């Protein structure tokens, strides 16, 4: 076999660059929200699974929280159940909640678990109802126009917010060398199911576990300034300034606020990562430049 010296040299450089990061993060917990394009492309799905298995193999503890909005929408359409959204949130009546549980807790969750396990991992699929992993309550949404004397309370059904996270279960799995894969379904005080935004679940899980990092995979290159340039590193103070001056707006606001709250809640750093890039998770963790935006309380890269 002929040795390709250029290829071998590149591999050596990559490993050399990664080694300090591996040492730094060994034994640490990283919570990764998996969604967007990274869940749709077969190549990206395979790369993600391999990334997760490699992280576990070098002593890092990944915890995966996944979305599944498009898959839910597809099944609702096939069942002729109409979808309605208010402020970006799916109105979830009882019939829709049944579909959400079926898709997230069944199809999507088990597909991810199976993919990770096929590449050598030991993943276990969970919903928030397992051992009351995610206790939740109904999310209250209000709207007020200048003509209203009081805000209007809008009922969006079985949409919830996180009350608490059962860290005992997750810590037991992590210490047992398992990789938890969590569907964002919460359980209420009376056993009712709640559909919860996956970013919010990932953020609350990261806070509860005192994770080293929260990583949110997206379909964009990262946070951008008004000139369209990616901002690779920001403090929480700088992010708040960008929100105030309108640089960050619209659909990115909930995701950014989730990342901010995680850092303010004790997570060392949050990352908005371009999930369209192959091996994005490894590149963000193990390279100097990364592939997205890092948010932290201290001066970042």
Curated annotation (Swiss-Prot):
Root EC class: transferase
Domain of life: Bacteria
GO function terms (MF aspect): acetylglutamate kinase activity; ATP binding
Catalytically driven reaction(s): N-acetyl-L-glutamate + ATP = N-acetyl-L-glutamyl 5-phosphate + ADP
Chain positions recorded as substrate binding sites: 68-69, 90, 195
Xref: CDD domains: AAK_NAGK-C
NCBIfam families: argB
Cited PANTHER family: N-ACETYLGLUTAMATE SYNTHASE, N-ACETYLGLUTAMATE SYNTHASE, MITOCHONDRIAL
Name under which the protein is recorded: Acetylglutamate kinase
Name of encoding gene: argB
